[in-house]
């Protein structure tokens, strides 16, 4: 009898906790990688942006940032589409690399329509970095060493063969008559882990993103050899030459933004879209975005969804031509 009553009380407690817990669910941004990379940059920028007075909502606590690495984003994606489909208070960071993984089938049978795309808040660019004490002073120095003996240079990056970081260095290699298949490529879980490996000497080069480099180069321990943009970037990386300036016509833009689960209500989804539109229109957000190393790019809702569908299809065609489709 006592055990039966105890079970009933326990069940009642769970129901009560669940009801009130749902009402007080903390607003969070989920970064599908380890701390210190571009996904974290996205979440931290949104965390600051939502506190702008014109955008902040009464009684809303600070955005919590959580991390769910694994499978170069696949673990977080699968968590949202299978178990957390209706969590309106959970924003998930994505990048152009996420779209590349979708195109190549690295998220299994995932499709663009599996989630609801909220907003793209800025554009990042690829970059190539080494340690401050590296013998490679320029991008040309590095490529000359790779051409002479690719086995002696270890390149770290987020993702596996076929990922956007792999493609960046591969495009530079091809333009220097180097077979990308000869490169020593170490797959790591996010840009933060790649820079940690670089600092520790486990890799000699990082193929990553400018926002990550902005974060990790502040102490002078990292030398950035090139940014993969059409023109030099403003802000902290203003003195870094582009690959084009060094004779290599390679540019790699990367959008950054967030999505929510597929069963988030229309009302909640539209609320997020309108709120991000308002946030991205403020001069305060423009300053915050520039400080993170991101450039101007703002798109949301249906327009963003259409853009992503086209981008994924373009990536799929390119990847198929390179034999990278699973």
Regions found by a protein language model. Name each.
Residues 9-19:
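Bacterial N-terminal signal peptides
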Residues 52-58, 79-90, 102-193, 243, ...:
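Hinge/capping helix and adjacent helix->loop/strand transition within the periplasmic-binding protein
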């Amino acid at each position: 009898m006592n055990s039966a009553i105890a079970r009933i009380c326990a069940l009642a407690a769970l129901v009560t906790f669940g009801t009130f817990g749902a009402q007080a669910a903390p607003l969070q941004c989920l970064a599908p990688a380890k701390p210190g990379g571009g996904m974290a940059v996205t979440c931290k920028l949104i965390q600051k942006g939502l506190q702008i007075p014109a955008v902040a909502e009464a009684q809303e606590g600070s955005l919590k940032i959580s991390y769910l690495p694994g499978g170069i984003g696949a673990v977080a994606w699968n968590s949202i589409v299978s178990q957390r489909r209706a969590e309106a208070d959970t924003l998930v960071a994505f990048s152009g690399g996420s779209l590349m993984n979708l195109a190549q089938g690295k998220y299994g049978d995932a499709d663009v329509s599996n989630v609801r795309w909220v907003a793209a808040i800025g554009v990042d660019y690829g970059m190539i970095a080494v340690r401050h004490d590296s013998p490679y002073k320029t991008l040309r120095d590095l490529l000359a060493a790779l051409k002479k003996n690719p086995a002696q240079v270890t390149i770290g990056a987020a993702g596996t063969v076929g990922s956007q970081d792999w493609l960046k260095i591969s495009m530079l290699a091809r333009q220097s008559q180097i077979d990308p298949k000869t490169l020593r490529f170490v797959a790591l879980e996010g840009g933060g882990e790649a820079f940690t490996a670089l600092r520790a000497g486990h890799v000699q080069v990082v193929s990553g993103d400018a926002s990550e480099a902005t974060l990790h180069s502040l102490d002078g321990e990292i030398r950035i050899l090139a940014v993969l943009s059409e023109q030099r970037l403003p802000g902290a990386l203003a003195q870094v030459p582009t690959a084009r300036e060094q004779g290599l016509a390679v540019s790699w833009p990367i959008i950054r933004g967030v999505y929510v689960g597929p069963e988030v209500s229309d009302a909640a989804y539209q609320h997020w879209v309108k709120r991000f539109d308002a946030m991205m229109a403020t001069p305060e957000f423009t300053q915050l975005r520039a400080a993170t190393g991101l450039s101007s790019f703002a798109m949301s809702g249906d327009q963003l969804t259409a853009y992503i569908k086209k981008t994924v299809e373009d990536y799929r065609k390119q990847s198929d031509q390179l034999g990278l489709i699973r």
